[in-house]
C-alpha cells in the first residue's frame, strides 16, 4: 500500500514499519514483503533473518566448544528483548559465559521456546526462578516495568548478588530502595551498535558496589564495545549522546548518501561510501587520539573542495543542531527520570 508520495509503507519481519523508496519497489504482487521486494529489484537487503538465525545457532555451538572466560558465574537476563538479547548474544559469541550459565526470560512462552532453540540457553517466563539461581542479574525491561520486576524477584535477592540495570533513567537508589537491602546495583547505558561489538556504554555504580563488582561490569560491557565509568549525575548525558547517538549518525549517513545520489552516484555505492567514511573517521579519532579538529584540518587544503563543503555545513548550522539534539535528548532523559 502506498501512503506517501515518495515511499511505500510496509512492515518488516520484526513488525516494524518500513519505508522503501519507490525506485526499489518490486513490480509484482502487493503481498510481497519489504525484503522480497528489495531482492527482486536487485537492491541489497539490510537484514536477512534466516542468516541471522543461522549465525546465532553457530555461535551457540561454538560456545559449547570453547571454555567460558567466567565459568563460576550464573547469569540471569530478565527481559531478553532488544538490548538484553544483544548482550546475551555477545556473551555467547565472546565466550564470556557458557550457554548453561545463562537463564534468560521473556514475556511469552512461545517466544521463550523459540529463543531457547535459537540461542541454546535456558529461556523461560519465570523471572523469580531465573533470579534465584543467578549471581549476576541483568535487568533488561523497560523503565516503567522495573518496580514491578524488583517486587517480583525480591524473594530471590540477597546482598551477595549483583544487579545491572540498563533501563533508561532509572536511578540506582530507586532500585536499592525497591530491593529493600544493601545490594549492589550498577546502572548501564549501552547502545545498539553493541550488536556488532562496536557499542559504547556508560556505567555508574550504586552505594553498595565493590571495586570487584565494578570491574566485572566493565568486563561484561567491554565484550560489546567501549566502556566508560561516570558519576550517576552524568548518565542522562550519556543517554542523550551515545545511547541516542546512533540515530543522529544514521541521519548523517543517510544525508551523505542522498548527496552522493544527487551528484550522480548509484544509491548502493553512495551508501557504502557514506557509511565507510563515517566509520573510518571515527576510527581515526579513536586510534590516533588526535582532536577531531586537527584531523579535519588535515583533510582541508587551502582553496580546496573540502573547505567549501565545510562552509556549507557551518552556514547550515550542523554543529549547533547536533549540540541541541544531544541537549534535548538529555533533557528528555531527565524528564523521564522525574516521572
Predicted regions and their residues:
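Internal alpha-helical scaffold of NAD(P)-dependent oxidoreductase catalytic cores
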Residues: 59, 174-184, 200-238, 250-287, ...
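NAD(P)-dependent Rossmann-like dehydrogenase/reductase catalytic/cofactor-binding core
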Residues: 57-69, 275-339
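Small-residue helix-packing motif on alpha-helices
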Residues: 102, 112, 130, 266-273, ...
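Short pre-catalytic strand/loop immediately N-terminal to key active-site residues, enriched for Gly-Thr
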Residues: 73, 235-240, 292-297
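NAD(P)+-binding Rossmann beta1-loop-alpha1 motif at the extreme N-terminus of oxidoreductases
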Residues: 47, 52-125, 129-133, 198-199, ...
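Intrinsic disorder/low-complexity segments
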Residues: 1-56
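Rossmann-like NAD(P)(H) cofactor-binding subdomain of soluble oxidoreductases
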Residues: 87, 103, 108-110, 119, ...
Amino acid at each position: 500500500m502506498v501512503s506517501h508520495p515518495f515511499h511505500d509503507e510496509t512492515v518488516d519481519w520484526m513488525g516494524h514499519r518500513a519505508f522503501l523508496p519507490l525506485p526499489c519497489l518490486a513490480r509484482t504482487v502487493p503481498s510481497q514483503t519489504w525484503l522480497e521486494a528489495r531482492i527482486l529489484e536487485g537492491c541489497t537487503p539490510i537484514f536477512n533473518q534466516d542468516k541471522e538465525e543461522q549465525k546465532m545457532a553457530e555461535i551457540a555451538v561454538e560456545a559449547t566448544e570453547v571454555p567460558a572466560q567466567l565459568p563460576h558465574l550464573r547469569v540471569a537476563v530478565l527481559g531478553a528483548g532488544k538490548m538484553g538479547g544483544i548482550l546475551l548474544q555477545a556473551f555467547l559469541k565472546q565466550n564470556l559465559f557458557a550457554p548453561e550459565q545463562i537463564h534468560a526470560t521473556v514475556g511469552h512462552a512461545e517466544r521463550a521456546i523459540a529463543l531457547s532453540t535459537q540461542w541454546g540457553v535456558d529461556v523461560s517466563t519465570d523471572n523469580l526462578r531465573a533470579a534465584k539461581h543467578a549471581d549476576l542479574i541483568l535487568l533488561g525491561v523497560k523503565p516503567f516495568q522495573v518496580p514491578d520486576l524488583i517486587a517480583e524477584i525480591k524473594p530471590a535477592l540477597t546482598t551477595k548478588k549483583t544487579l545491572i540495570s540498563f533501563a533508561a533513567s532509572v536511578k540506582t537508589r530507586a532500585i536499592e530502595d525497591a530491593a529493600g537491602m544493601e545490594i549492589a546495583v550498577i546502572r548501564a547505558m549501552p547502545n545498539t551498535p553493541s550488536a556488532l561489538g562496536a557499542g559504547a556504554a556508560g556505567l555508574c555504580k550504586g552505594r553498595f558496589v565493590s571495586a570487584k563488582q565494578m570491574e566485572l561490569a566493565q568486563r561484561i560491557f567491554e565484550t560489546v564495545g567501549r566502556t566508560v565509568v561516570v558519576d550517576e549525575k552524568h548518565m542522562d548525558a550519556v543517554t542523550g549522546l551515545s545511547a541516542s547517538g546512533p540515530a543522529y549518525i544514521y541521519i548523517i549517513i543517510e544525508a551523505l548518501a542522498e548527496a552522493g545520489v544527487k551528484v550522480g552516484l548509484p544509491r548502493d555505492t553512495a551508501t557504502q561510501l557514506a557509511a565507510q567514511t563515517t566509520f573510518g573517521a571515527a576510527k581515526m579519532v579513536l586510534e590516533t587520539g588526535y582532536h577531531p579538529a586537527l584531523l579535519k584540518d588535515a583533510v582541508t587544503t587551502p582553496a580546496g573542495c573540502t573547505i567549501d563543503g565545510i562552509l556549507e555545513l557551518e552556514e547550515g548550522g550542523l554543529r549547533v543542531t547536533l549540540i541541541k539534539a544531544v541537549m534535548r535528548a538529555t533533557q528528555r532523559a531527565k524528564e523521564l527520570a522525574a516521572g
